[in-house]
Amino acid sequence: MRTDYCGLIDTRYLDQTVTVKGWVHRRRDHGGVIFIDLRDREGLVQVVIDPDTPEAFATADSARNEFVLSITGRVRRRPEGTTNAKMISGEIELLAKEIEILNAAATPPFQIDDENLSETVRLTNRVIDLRRPAMQKNLRLRYQVAMGVRRYLDAQGFIDIETPMLTRSTPEGARDYLVPSRVHPGEFFALPQSPQLFKQLLMVAGFDRYYQIVKCFRDEDLRADRQPEFTQIDLETSFLNEDDIMDITEGMARQVFHDAMDVELGDFPRMTYADAMHYYGSDKPDLRVSLKFAELTDVMKDVPFKVFNAAANLPNGRVVALRVPGGAKLSRKEIDEYTQFVGIYGAKGLAYIKVNDVSKLTTDETSGLQSPIVKNLTEGVLKSIVERTGAENGDIIFFGADKAKVVNEAIGALRIRIGHEHGEAGGYFVREWRPLWVVDFPMFEYDEDDDRWTACHHPFTSPKPGHEDLMATDPGACIARAYDMVLNGWEIGGGSIRIHRADVQEKVFGALKISPEEQQNKFGFLLDNLKFGAPPHGGLAFGLDRLVTLMAGADSIRDVIAFPKTQRAQCLLTNAPNAVDEKQLKELSLRLRQKADVAGGAA
């Protein structure tokens, strides 16, 4: 029987005989003595095998990396000068008496401690990849976070209730994963994008406080922080307002960070969506970077410089400045790189002014401002730029001028990049956790392609009191009772107070141009049950994968999921998705359309 994990054998076991079991991490032959580093989930222990135990020595001599061994031996102190303070077992070693090979191993596709691996190699050989200490650490952290959430919510009176995995297809903004029904030919279940409607119905049923750590599914284009199947920490409450829900979930975040990482989160300031977009160009601002936008749209409407003038006079245009303290020393090469970078977000260029002497705001060769655009601006405008940005000698000011969406995304991304690259040295970046709440989101946003209003969060979010009538007269001015928890530029949780009256829910559907017939067809079960005394209710969902990615400092969300999909929604380990045979399709009353034969295609 195993005495303890390899990584936990320490000086407590000195002079005792112990048995450990694990994988050969490394094997070394030094002058007739064999050393094996045996690994399990808790770490390594150094095993020494000398020729005085010939049977154990012969077995050790035949062992190779990743063989599975059971080793019994006596614990002794390592010789002076060979200890390793970074390991729990670093002061001791195990002098082997008996070694049993529990299983041999083929040569692994890579060394466990190899850190220079492509993601394709790692995901194809995911089982071996999961043996790496970094992956073990990430998944242990994920477990600790999940357990911390459960402990906290249990203590707060929440009940863990499962909701269906097979449900009906309802529009929630992304494509559904559909599951054909064998019993009902031609009809389909959908895998849930969230438990949203079921958790609201649980509130109508009187459960008061619900939570669930649950899988959700969205068939959408994938990015670094997205997966087709992902895990939510989902909760819903009755009879609480926004402040109550934010207080509860803020407490949960504090406890999880304390228990899992020994981190004390600071204050959670609240910022309106309007302020977040005005100052940071993002509804999930990274407050570690202190740089802010300065609004210049109003002063650029009549300037001779066409780039600024045209943008300032667009109905949805915007002109902003971003002051970078000490940025005048940026090289031409760096500025060119930033110009290319903002182009990714649709910006057509990146104007800038280097501030050499703020006392000389002229437009001629005597100017203390260095830039090709200075001559196209007036002294009054230059003064406004310096005053609004608070620019000082040695600074650089970057400008964004375009549709507001382009400006927000391009200059917002530039703000983050410059902050991370130069902020610590320049005093405008702090390396710590900076949480906040973003509140007062718009209820709707206009989709120009479809010529209609769409829900910013989802169509079950309640408007602020007094805003119900705006849904029919001015949807763009309607504010939602929605809130997002943001941490270091990542939205880690989002929620809202829900609509608990059927008549208000019908008004929202109407504003979204969902006909009464479609409302009843797709959401009749919700509307009908809201009429049976639904309590005021609201909730929030955290993305567990995203939260753990942030806490672990991982490069990708795939580094905190045991068996993730690629950005093409494939599992390289199992080669899923895969074709199925004709018999299975026939049972489901399905027939695949053949791909068009384009050999020698049309001219």
Swiss-Prot record:
GO MF, one annotated term: nucleic acid binding
Subcellular location: Cytoplasm
Residues the entry annotates as binding L-aspartate: 172, 218, 457, 498
Nucleotide-binding among keywords: yes
CDD domains: AspRS_core, EcAspRS_like_N
Domain of life from the UniProt record: Bacteria
Marked site: Important for tRNA non-discrimination: 30, 81
This protein's GO CC annotations: cytoplasm
Residue numbers binding ATP: 218-220, 227, 491, 543-546
Catalyzed reactions per annotation: tRNA(Asx) + L-aspartate + ATP = L-aspartyl-tRNA(Asx) + AMP + diphosphate
Pfam families, per database record: GAD (PF02938), tRNA-synt_2 (PF00152), tRNA_anti-codon (PF01336)
Chief localization: cytoplasm
EC number(s) recorded for this UniProt protein: 6.1.1.23
Keywords per UniProt: Aminoacyl-tRNA synthetase, ATP-binding, Cytoplasm, Ligase, Nucleotide-binding, Protein biosynthesis
GO biological process terms on file: aspartyl-tRNA aminoacylation
Biological role: Aspartyl-tRNA synthetase with relaxed tRNA specificity since it is able to aspartylate not only its cognate tRNA(Asp) but also tRNA(Asn). Reaction proceeds in two steps: L-aspartate is first activated by ATP to form Asp-AMP and then transferred to the acceptor end of tRNA(Asp/Asn).
Subunit structure, interactors included: Homodimer.
Protein family (similarity comment): Belongs to the class-II aminoacyl-tRNA synthetase family. Type 1 subfamily.
Protein name as catalogued: Aspartate--tRNA(Asp/Asn) ligase
Gene this chain is encoded by: aspS
